[in-house]
Amino acid sequence: MKLLTGLVFCSLVLSVSSRSFFSFLGEAFDGARDMWRAYSDMREANYIGSDKYFHARGNYDAAKRGPGGAWAAEVISNARENIQRLTGRGAEDSLADQAANKWGRSGRDPNHFRPAGLPEKY
């Protein structure tokens, strides 16, 4: 519901043309896929200390898609961190995750967070 409300707000208030609106939706969809791929890779790698790298990489890949991808990355990242905070995960770790998320969304190299020894596949 929040996604729909956000999209309606963007289209009405910002007077987005139908062409750019559908472009935004496509970017958001592709960005969400990038985030899912990073999450899946993180689970598959199961490598200690790599979570910040995968946070940054997912946000980086999504933001490269354009404004829709960056928006999707921010919404997904914030939702994930809020859910984890509610389930008792530490605030300090959540802040570090958010810093990695912002790093990636800003277009900076996610390899900054890459731990030594993480297989090249990732």
Curated annotation (Swiss-Prot):
Keywords: Acute phase, Amyloid, Amyloidosis, HDL, Secreted, Signal. It is linked to Reactive, secondary amyloidosis is characterized by the extracellular accumulation in various tissues of the SAA2 protein. These deposits are highly insoluble and resistant to proteolysis; they disrupt tissue structure and compromise function. It comes from Homo sapiens. PANTHER family: SERUM AMYLOID A, SERUM AMYLOID A PROTEIN. One of its GO terms (biological process) is acute-phase response. Expressed by the liver; secreted in plasma. Induction: Upon cytokine stimulation. Residues 1-18 form the signal peptide. SMART domains: SAA. Apolipoprotein of the HDL complex. This is Serum amyloid A-2 protein. The keyword Hydrolase does not apply. It is found in: Secreted. Residues 88-122 are annotated as: Disordered. One of its GO terms (cellular component) is high-density lipoprotein particle. Major acute phase reactant. The keyword Signal applies. Pfam families: SAA. Its main location: secreted. Belongs to the SAA family.
